[in-house]
UniProtKB/Swiss-Prot annotation:
EC number: 3.1.1.22
Protein name: D-(-)-3-hydroxybutyrate oligomer hydrolase
Residues in the signal sequence: 1-32
Function text: Participates in the degradation of poly-3-hydroxybutyrate (PHB). It works downstream of poly(3-hydroxybutyrate) depolymerase, hydrolyzing D(-)-3-hydroxybutyrate oligomers of various length (3HB-oligomers) into 3HB-monomers.
GO cellular component: extracellular space
One function term, GO molecular function aspect: hydroxybutyrate-dimer hydrolase activity
Length: 706
């Protein structure tokens, strides 16, 4: 291994056919009057890897379009995967987690690595050569360690520069937006500025005291030190006591960092853009007079920057645009943003005969409500539920427990279930999402409720908030079914590549510490009287945190207040696309009120358009599940179009579309087989929609076409 230095690039060569790892640092002082490119002070060591676009690449990690649609890559030594192997596994899983990877669903025709930037289907595997730069953003303590990543394709043109943000969706790691804004940016020759926003795969195995490093390898917390992605804030004495009381548990960064990182998602997104500018100017800036430094050549005045991503990453993009005091962001194009709006009683949103006043509900409000009601509501329409894995007996017990708590009414289970569903609809869920309540409870809602409660309240893992903890659990046929057990060493070793950042993930589950007889897997735990009811006490405890007066509740409420956004995009052009049937981030709680609040605060200066898509929901990857594909279309198709339209506007002045409802056509079935998707199923966004499809704002009222 040799080290040389040139133009602030310290090059560490590795004997590998496909990559050279670089360590990038600011150096040189420059001369008076020169605008020297300087590394932001919050950035740590920058590690860079070159990819040839054949054996390995930026978009597919060498897998190509075919490999992303095939079986998952594995490490040669599952217990000791290399950083390169972990990266490949991460890109494979994160790409597929956001998209439907079925040919019939549009992969390879509407989207995918082989579909070029103009939408033309090619025979290419879609591999993209370029260089990738990774670093932590931190305040010097090692407690933040927000992972930042910049990808610069070889097609980047410094004469026509562009940057796209790729803040991770959900609680995902730094590659979380690879298939959404990452793919769009790389195909269009833009640098992509990613960040895990302080969530990601920071998993601290408290029993064995091991943690993730920046590139995914695992080490002891002691050996990792400040290089750890996340180490729980426990003294050795506290950790020993915790392990004695609750063995085999895990602390996870999003839940247990005690920083309420969501309040800073906009900040981290802006820092990712600044990181991208630093990298680009190190590569393309002219040499300074000292012969070592580089001058700032690319800057907001000559570079297009689109803040983008989906879900939580989309909310981060909007937050970044609100916070942008340096003019870093030129425009915004996002999909299904998880965005929470400051209260404003002036606003109301109308769709048909339904009117909701105010600016919607907070994430924890609708997550904790769904966590209570969804299992019972799943029984309201059992024949039409999509991919329903809710246990009927346990759900019936949940209905009875809700009735005993005075939260629903009815004389039969059917009536109780109908009332639970009615209360979800009255809260603001769209009727189109009713068939999804069951599957969302099974796959998403409890995870969101538990993790975000911990995050908002800045709770430590040792607090065991509402009796919840995270652990691997025994298989049904094992000696200790559903009880906490030691986790799989192989699953932990590859957690950087396979984890979504929010338990249940990589075999780490949500555990009810208060289960009768001892801790058990939450869904299988026993309530008072040894009743299986999906842990009603835990669900009620979480709900109390929203509006209660306990010390824990006040902490959570403070944290929620810290993440509310104003709707002020400072007049930046912006596009939001959102599926009407979204049951994870319902439109009535997010995009609709955000659109209205933006119109109130910006008035005539607002350049935000809102696109609501019928027959689209939150998780395109779920389109592969039974019942989803025939009912719903890929929202990703409209994300791509929104990005195309925003780029055209910023580059050529092309008109942005007016706010509208796009009316799609479900694929349906032929016999038991879902029909292949065609362009007729997903008509394009119109620049000027028909009157019957318009979304309008007047007199503080958002009116959404029914």
């Amino acid at each position: 291994m040799t080290t040389t230095s040139k133009n602030c690039l310290t090059l560490t060569s590795i004997a590998a056919a496909v990559a050279a790892v670089l360590v990038l640092s600011a150096c040189g002082g420059g001369s008076a009057g020169e605008n020297i490119n300087r590394k932001p002070t919050y950035l740590g060591t920058v590690v860079s890897v070159n990819y040839d676009g054949a054996s390995d690449d930026l978009l597919t990690a060498g897998l190509g379009k075919t490999g992303l649609g095939a079986t998952a890559p594995v490490a040669a030594d599952p217990l000791n995967p290399t950083a390169a192997e972990l990266r490949r596994i991460a890109i494979f899983n994160n790409y597929r987690a956001l998209l439907d990877i079925s040919v019939a669903g549009g992969y390879g025709s509407l989207y995918g690595p082989n579909v070029d930037a103009s939408g033309v289907i090619t025979t290419s595997e879609g591999k993209i050569a370029g260089t990738e730069y990774m670093a932590y953003s931190d305040d010097g303590t090692g407690n933040q360690n927000i992972t930042m990543l910049v990808q610069v394709p070889t097609t980047f043109n410094p004469a026509s520069p562009c940057i796209v943000t790729g803040t991770s969706s959900g609680s995902r790691g730094v590659y979380g937006a690879i298939g959404t804004s990452g793919e769009w940016g790389l195909k269009n020759g833009c640098a992509v500025a990613y960040t895990d926003k302080g969530t990601g795969t920071g998993i601290h195995d408290l029993q064995n005291d091991t943690v993730n490093l920046q590139r995914g390898e695992r080490a002891t917390a002691t050996a990792a030190g400040k290089a750890s992605n996340f180490t729980a804030s426990l003294t050795s004495t506290e950790r020993a006591a915790f392990n004695t009381a609750t063995p085999n548990r895990f602390a996870v960064k999003h839940a247990h960092s005690q920083q309420n990182t969501e309040k800073d998602w906009g900040k981290w997104t802006l820092q990712a853009v600044e990181f991208a500018y630093f990298v680009l100017n190190e590569n393309y800036g002219d040499a300074a007079k000292d012969g070592v430094s580089r001058l700032v050549k690319l800057k907001p005045a000559n570079t297009i920057v689109i803040a983008s991503s989906a879900s939580n990453g989309a909310g981060a993009a909007l937050a970044a645009a609100e916070l942008d005091t340096k003019g870093l962001i030129t425009g915004v194009a996002v999909a299904e943003p998880q965005i929470q709006v400051v209260p404003d009683t002036r606003l109301s949103v109308r769709r048909g005969a339904s009117t909701l006043g105010g600016t919607g509900r907070s994430l924890f409000d609708y997550a904790s409500l769904g966590n209570l009601l969804q299992p019972c509501a799943a029984l309201a329409s059992p024949t039409t539920n999509v991919f329903n894995t809710v246990n009927t007996t346990i759900a019936t017990n949940r209905c009875n427990a809700l009735q005993a708590s005075g939260l629903i009414v009815g004389n039969t289970t059917a009536e109780l279930a109908a009332d639970a569903m009615a209360r979800l609809l009255a809260a603001g869920h769209q009727p189109e999402s009713s068939v999804l309540q069951a599957s969302h409870y099974s796959f998403a809602t409890p995870a969101v409720a538990v993790t975000f409660a911990n995050s908002y309240g800045r709770f430590s893992v040792k607090d065991n908030l509402c009796g919840f903890s995270f652990a691997a659990t025994g298989a049904a046929g094992s000696a200790t079914p559903n009880a906490p057990v030691a986790a799989s060493a192989a699953a932990l070793a590859t957690s950087f590549g396979a984890s979504n950042g929010i338990p249940p993930t990589v075999g780490i589950n949500i555990v009810n510490n208060n289960s009768v007889g001892g801790p058990l897997l939450d869904a299988a735990s026993l309530s008072a009287g040894s009743v299986l009811d999906y842990n009603i006490a835990g669900a009620l405890c979480l709900r109390e945190l929203l509006g209660g007066s306990s010390a824990n509740a006040l902490k959570v409420q403070q944290g929620i207040n810290e993440v509310l956004r104003t709707g002020d995009l400072q007049g930046k052009p912006a596009l939001i696309v959102h599926g009407r049937a979204d049951a994870q981030v319902p439109v009535a709680f997010s995009s609709r009120p955000y659109f209205g609040r933006n119109k109130i605060v910006e008035g005539a200066n607002s350049r935000l358009s809102y696109i609501e898509v019928t027959n689209a929901q939150h998780f395109d990857a779920f389109l592969a599940f039974p019942g989803y594909g025939e009912r719903f279309v890929p929202a990703h198709r409209y994300f791509i179009q929104a990005m195309d339209m925003m780029y055209a506007n910023l580059k050529t002045g092309a008109a942005l579309p007016a706010s509208q409802v796009v009316r799609t056509v479900p694929r349906g079935l032929t016999g038991a087989v879902v029909n292949p998707i065609t362009p007729a199923n997903v008509p394009p966004i119109k620049t000027v929609p028909a009157v019957a499809d318009q979304i309008t704002f007047a007199n503080n009222v958002v009116t959404v076409a029914d």
